[in-house]
């Protein structure tokens, strides 16, 4: 997902409806640090497509795989770290390709 995936689009009720969960679950996930939606000037939570994708991961891990929230936190941290490392590898491969020319 590009930068457009980070644009805040959905208020909490719409995000909950998209995901098929209750709004209090979204508030709890935020409190636990699993998700951090942007806030409007009026302090309204706004969820991006990237947030929705992450919340789908949370839902899958909890409902389908029975992982508790502490486990989900660790898994999401590892996913983020792997993603960061993959981006770094791609950058280094590009640099290496330039130096070989």
Q: Which sequence ranges carry the predicted segments?
A:
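Basic helix-turn-helix/winged-helix DNA-binding cores
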Residues: 1-56, 60
